[in-house]
Amino acid sequence: MYPRQAWRAIKAGMPDDVIISSDIGNNCAIGNAYQTFEKPRKYLAPGLFGPCGYGFPSILGAKIGCPDVPVIGFAGDGAFGISMNEMSSCAREEWPAITMVIFRNYQWGAEKRNTTLWFNNNFIGTELDPE
């Protein structure tokens, strides 16, 4: 399934009061074009500085602040790898349920795309080992 298809399918099933957060990277940037909100403070965006690993901790904070509101986070496998240690935080006590969508393509996709564009398909260090 392509990221656009995943975003559309998930968006179709989202409740109106959901809080979402996306990380940085190609998969999440695609989704930014599909979200619409009727109320403020429903989208936690990483901003322009590229804080890789932002998506997961931000929905944890949103769930603590609004425990009765559903939260959904989106990240690529590389970005999630940076923040997955936060899983130990939410496992320490009884936490309300969250949803985290992880797009798996086994690469630092944005970096790979940029290096292939700028350096004539010469890239290194952008592949993630699926093992």
Task: Indicate residue ranges for each PLM-predicted region.
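Thiamine diphosphate
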Residues: 30-131
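Cofactor-pocket helix-loop regions in the catalytic cores of large enzyme subunits
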Residues: 1-42, 46, 84
